[in-house]
Amino acid sequence: MDFIIDIIKKIVGLFTGK
């Protein structure tokens, strides 16, 4: 389930990048 972690990191990056 590494792809799930990658997707979560992308979503988190959007929030942290805001």
UniProtKB/Swiss-Prot annotation:
GO terms for cellular component: extracellular region
Single GO MF annotation: toxin activity
The keyword Flavoprotein appears for this protein: no
UniProt keyword terms in alphabetical order: Cytolysis, Formylation, Hemolysis, Secreted, Toxin, Virulence
Location relative to the cell: Secreted
Residues bearing PTM N-formylmethionine: M1
An individual GO BP term: killing of cells of another organism
Function per UniProt: Virulence factor. Causes hemolysis of erythrocytes from sheep (HD(50)=4.79 mM), rabbit (HD(50)=8.76 mM), guinea pig (HD(50)=2.00 mM), dog (HD(50)=5.35 mM) and human (HD(50)=6.34 mM). Acts synergistically with beta-hemolysins from S.aureus ATCC 25923. Cytotoxic towards human dermal fibroblasts.
Protein name as it appears in the record: Hemolysin H2C
Species of provenance: Staphylococcus cohnii subsp. cohnii
